[in-house]
């Protein structure tokens, strides 16, 4: 893989992993553009591309760790302190808040995993046509627009329960549909459950950590099954990793800026324009979708 292609794919991953617009649609567009230029790309299901996807996913994990480091550090300290206090009570009085949040996060991931493993193939088959992607992009824009019009939310961390965690986890699972965005779905439905904007953002992106780890593990298993590719170069992997991490930090901070100020609708105009271009054929996804 050429270094400039690795850098470009790292940029796409870093931007659209966090912006509330579809990463799938943009990866397809990028691959289509590269193919139209006469560039040779390995098939998406090849060991080379799976390994590259694994590496850039880890790069976006670094982005989350950098941006949310203060919150992650606070969470860890409070979890350790709460566990010590809970043990001192002999395990009485219920789980400490931060341990409860940890297990609720795992429940969200479980909901995502069950839905994803059950319906992923169906989503990719039924929703992989350009017209269906245009439809899911339009839905994303509507949800983002509606989110900005919601009254101020009042639910804090203590208000997160199994129902809230389940709703957010299922929303993340439905984001496997081509044209839907993981960050958009989790943030939007977190707000719909009543979470304040700050906690909706933090829960959404904290949830991305175990989700990305699980996806990375599945990708690693697939690479092992297919055999480590000989055609992928360390330099291309390194470039993709570094670019995805740096660009991811910028895009993550941008999302937080707009979310806190109830301005996610600026992304609505973009995804609607993209949906219109795909629906009318001005943007042709058919060759890349096969």
UniProtKB/Swiss-Prot annotation:
<dbReference type="InterPro" id="IPR003824">
    <property type="entry name" value="UppP"/>
</dbReference>
<dbReference type="GO" id="GO:0071555">
    <property type="term" value="P:cell wall organization"/>
</dbReference>
<feature type="transmembrane region" description="Helical">
    <location>
        <begin position="232"/>
        <end position="252"/>
    </location>
</feature>
<dbReference type="Pfam" id="PF02673">
    <property type="entry name" value="BacA"/>
</dbReference>
<keyword id="KW-1003">Cell membrane</keyword>
<feature type="transmembrane region" description="Helical">
    <location>
        <begin position="101"/>
        <end position="121"/>
    </location>
</feature>
<dbReference type="GO" id="GO:0009252">
    <property type="term" value="P:peptidoglycan biosynthetic process"/>
</dbReference>
<feature type="transmembrane region" description="Helical">
    <location>
        <begin position="126"/>
        <end position="146"/>
    </location>
</feature>
<keyword id="KW-0812">Transmembrane</keyword>
<feature type="transmembrane region" description="Helical">
    <location>
        <begin position="203"/>
        <end position="223"/>
    </location>
</feature>
<protein>
    <recommendedName>
        <fullName>Undecaprenyl-diphosphatase</fullName>
        <ecNumber>3.6.1.27</ecNumber>
    </recommendedName>
</protein>
<keyword id="KW-0046">Antibiotic resistance</keyword>
<feature type="transmembrane region" description="Helical">
    <location>
        <begin position="1"/>
        <end position="21"/>
    </location>
</feature>
<feature type="transmembrane region" description="Helical">
    <location>
        <begin position="266"/>
        <end position="286"/>
    </location>
</feature>
<comment type="similarity">
    <text>Belongs to the UppP family.</text>
</comment>
<keyword id="KW-1133">Transmembrane helix</keyword>
<feature type="transmembrane region" description="Helical">
    <location>
        <begin position="49"/>
        <end position="69"/>
    </location>
</feature>
<keyword id="KW-0997">Cell inner membrane</keyword>
<keyword id="KW-0472">Membrane</keyword>
<comment type="function">
    <text>Catalyzes the dephosphorylation of undecaprenyl diphosphate (UPP). Confers resistance to bacitracin.</text>
</comment>
<dbReference type="GO" id="GO:0046677">
    <property type="term" value="P:response to antibiotic"/>
</dbReference>
<keyword id="KW-0961">Cell wall biogenesis/degradation</keyword>
<feature type="transmembrane region" description="Helical">
    <location>
        <begin position="160"/>
        <end position="180"/>
    </location>
</feature>
<dbReference type="GO" id="GO:0008360">
    <property type="term" value="P:regulation of cell shape"/>
</dbReference>
<keyword id="KW-0378">Hydrolase</keyword>
<dbReference type="GO" id="GO:0005886">
    <property type="term" value="C:plasma membrane"/>
</dbReference>
<dbReference type="GO" id="GO:0050380">
    <property type="term" value="F:undecaprenyl-diphosphatase activity"/>
</dbReference>
<keyword id="KW-0573">Peptidoglycan synthesis</keyword>
<keyword id="KW-0133">Cell shape</keyword>
